[in-house]
Regions:
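Basic nucleic-acid-binding interfaces
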Residues: 4-8, 14, 27, 45-47, ...
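Enriched for short, Lys/Arg-rich terminal
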Residues: 2-7, 11, 19-22, 55-61, ...
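A short, surface-exposed loop/turn module that caps and links secondary-structure elements
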Residues: 30-54
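Flexible, active-site-adjacent loop/turn segments at secondary-structure boundaries
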Residues: 1, 38-43, 80-81
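Conserved short hydrophobic interaction patches
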Residues: 27-30, 79
Length: 84
């Protein structure tokens, strides 16, 4: 599975604590290797086609779109803000 990150995603990621940035790298690598791993808490977003979320840390989520075999990450943030 290929992984891509938008410029917006990278800007938001850079603003997060270093520990969250490191966990994000681990979770994205895990997604590329095993999308069904239970620690990802992989979920389809109900109101959007081909849009999913994974848990980065207890309160952080990364949002991405699936296009064939590519995950395009476009949002990351605290769970209370990222779904807006």
């Amino acid at each position: 599975m290929r992984i891509e990150q938008t410029t917006r995603f990278n800007k938001h990621l850079a603003r997060l604590p270093v520990s969250v940035q490191e966990q994000c790298a681990k979770q994205i690598a895990l997604l590329a290797d095993n999308p069904r791993h239970p620690s990802l808490h992989f979920k389809k977003l109900a109101d959007r086609d081909d849009t999913y979320s994974i848990r980065i840390a207890s309160n952080y989520r990364a949002i991405f779109m699936m296009a064939h075999d590519t995950c395009i990450f476009f949002a990351i943030g605290h769970r209370k803000d990222v779904y807006r």
